């Protein structure tokens, strides 16, 4: 394997150093000022300055192009489109998008915690809160996996295996997801030192009651992520691919961003970038499992780090 040129290594080191300095400056600003707005404005300015510095390098712009536009064009080249499809109304696209709308509506109005509280108002059960998360996760499996799979079973010529559930592309490109996790991990570790983080995670506040509680919650959480990846990066992307090609990614990120409404704005905006990256990788590798691995790995890491600030298992006192 050819070694990267020294100029490339030097550039990467400068970029890593500049990002580190920017992050340190943002955290220094948070500790030095009591003004929330000053911290927010300063963080935005520092972030924009860092972005401008990174994009000022032609080599970096070339790298960005290689992992974005070049990949989308490759997806379009791989997509088999019948000439007869051009300019025609697609019943398949209509069905796919209607199923997406119905499934998301069910999540909001029936599969939510508020709906669980309406249907099961008796909170006296020891595991009432955990059952609430089972309700939430179960509806994700139903709406994101079961309903789409039933839909595909009735669509002529469609095979569920074609909807990015193969492991073949996952193993071949596992290193990409390992690099992504390595980049995300330090950010998660830094975030875990904040009070806001410790008061938010784990979402199941009784996760420290017992090992059974913890791993039951993690299993429900993982099932939800698997379902989400199949729905957005499998069912929706592959369902639209023949007619839209790589443009299907940009259709997908709209509802994917919207399911994050109600969360902090940085997380919701971050979902746009995450959707683009995971969508591109899913279409290129024809596998959703990398996205599942990233989601489950990051979520489990966040919970484990958050548990450091929780009372001990069996103490009778719960997280946040």
Question: Model-derived features: where do they sit?
Answer:
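Juxtamembrane helix-loop-helix connectors linking adjacent transmembrane helices
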Residues: 113-141, 153-224, 242, 312-320
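Hydrophobic alpha-helical transmembrane segments
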Residues: 12, 16, 94-98, 173-178, ...
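Interfacial transmembrane-helix boundary/kink motif in multi-pass membrane proteins
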Residues: 3-15, 67-102, 123-138, 158-187
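Aromatic-anchored segments of alpha-helical transmembrane domains
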Residues: 19-29, 101-109, 123-125, 182-191, ...
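Membrane-interface helix/loop boundary segments of multi-pass membrane proteins
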Residues: 166, 227-251, 280-287
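Functionally important transmembrane alpha-helices
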Residues: 249-253, 257-259, 265-320
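Alpha-helical transmembrane segments in multi-pass membrane proteins
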Residues: 33-53, 88-155
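Membrane-embedded alpha-helical segments of multi-pass membrane proteins
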Residues: 42-48, 138-147, 211-215, 219, ...
């Amino acid at each position: 394997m050819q070694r990267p040129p020294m100029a490339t290594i030097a550039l990467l080191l400068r970029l890593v150093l500049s990002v580190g300095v920017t992050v340190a400056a943002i955290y220094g600003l948070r500790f030095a000022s009591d003004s929330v707005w000053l911290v927010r404005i300063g963080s935005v300015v520092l972030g924009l300055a860092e972005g401008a510095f990174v994009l000022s390098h032609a080599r970096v712009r070339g790298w960005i192009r290689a992992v974005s536009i070049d990949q989308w064009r490759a997806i379009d080249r791989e997509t088999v489109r019948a000439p007869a499809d051009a300019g025609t109304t697609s019943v398949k696209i209509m069905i796919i998008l209607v199923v997406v709308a119905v499934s998301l509506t069910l999540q909001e109005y029936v599969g939510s915690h508020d709906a669980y509280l309406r249907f099961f108002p008796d909170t006296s059960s020891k595991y009432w809160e955990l059952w609430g998360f089972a309700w939430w996760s179960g509806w994700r499996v139903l709406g994101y996996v079961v309903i789409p799979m039933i839909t595909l079973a009735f669509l002529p010529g469609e095979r569920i295996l074609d909807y990015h559930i193969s492991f073949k592309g996952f193993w071949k490109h596992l290193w990409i997801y390992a690099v992504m996790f390595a980049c995300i991990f330090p950010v998660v570790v830094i975030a875990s030192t904040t009070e806001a983080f410790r008061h938010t995670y784990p979402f199941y506040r009784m996760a420290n009651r017992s090992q059974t509680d913890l791993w039951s919650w993690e299993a429900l959480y993982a099932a939800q992520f698997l379902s989400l990846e199949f729905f957005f990066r499998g069912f929706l992307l592959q369902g639209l691919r023949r007619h839209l090609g790589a443009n299907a990614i940009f259709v997908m990120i709209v509802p994917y961003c919207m399911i994050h409404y109600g969360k902090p704005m940085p997380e919701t905006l971050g979902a746009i970038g995450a959707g683009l990256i995971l969508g591109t990788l899913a279409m290129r590798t024809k596998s959703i499992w990398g996205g599942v691995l990233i989601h489950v790995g990051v979520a489990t890491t966040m919970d484990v780090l958050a548990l450091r600030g929780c009372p001990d298992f069996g103490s009778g006192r719960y997280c946040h």
